[in-house]
Amino acid sequence: MQDQRAEYDEAKDRLYVQLLDESVDNTVALDDRRSVDYAADGRIVGVQFAKPFAGGINLSGIPLARVVGALILQSGHKFRMVE
């Protein structure tokens, strides 16, 4: 999909991986650094990672982890992947 992308906000130290260009209806926090946004129909809109440089990126338990990981790699940022 052309709407898919990973964007890092340096000021907020947050990485957002957008999977769909849809409105967010519900956000589910996986832990204190990761959350998943859902559309009203249950599709995944995006995934947010807080402090990705300090804590690394953990894809464990992330829906569509392979797609999310590929978009992060394509972003050009050098985030450390952790388990």
Task: Name the predicted role of every residue range.
Residues M1-E83:
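Small, basic N-terminal interaction modules of short regulatory proteins
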